[in-house]
């Protein structure tokens, strides 16, 4: 399957507006486009994920995107939200099918991979998959919940979670 990648234009046209419209009721998001360094760093991530030598599988690519974006401080605020929405966009433009799991099943999967994390319910997130990504982004953003200090091991764990969650045609 030939993958379609999220571009900077996608971020400006789709990702950032989605965040501002739907994910700012509890905490404001910055105007991402005005952060020159953050936008530059985001662009590098979006380019590097295309490298099949480093990220040969869909799960590897998805893991790299989420871990790199949610686990960094490229922007003053909203890095986890950018990571989650970029992943959702990546899934959407590639017509990826999700495992039909309940929120409880996603909780169980996440607790096995990251036992130090207690599932956080967000009343604004009703979709089980979105709740899973939200909680996974929280784990990635907090090294104390990883169970390791090794970023490569974190990416491998996240890739394994994604292998069982997404079906690429």
Predicted features along the sequence, with ranges:
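FIC/Doc superfamily catalytic core
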Residues: 1-169
């Amino acid at each position: 399957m030939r993958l379609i990648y999220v571009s900077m234009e996608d971020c400006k046209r789709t990702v950032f507006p989605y965040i501002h419209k739907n994910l700012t009721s509890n905490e404001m998001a910055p105007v991402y486009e005005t952060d020159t360094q953050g936008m530059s760093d985001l662009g590098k991530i979006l380019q590097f994920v295309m490298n099949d030598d480093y990220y040969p599988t869909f799960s590897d690519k998805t893991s790299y995107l989420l871990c790199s974006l949610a686990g960094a401080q490229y922007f003053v605020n909203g890095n986890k939200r950018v990571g989650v929405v970029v992943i959702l966009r990546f899934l959407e433009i590639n017509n990826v099918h999700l495992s039909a799991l309940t929120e409880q099943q996603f909780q169980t999967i996440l607790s096995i991979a990251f036992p130090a994390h207690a599932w956080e319910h967000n009343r604004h997130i009703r979709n089980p998959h979105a709740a899973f990504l939200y909680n996974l982004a929280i784990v990635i953003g907090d090294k104390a919940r990883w169970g390791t200090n090794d970023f490569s091991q974190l990416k491998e764990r996240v890739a394994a979670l994604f292998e069982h969650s997404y079906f690429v045609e």
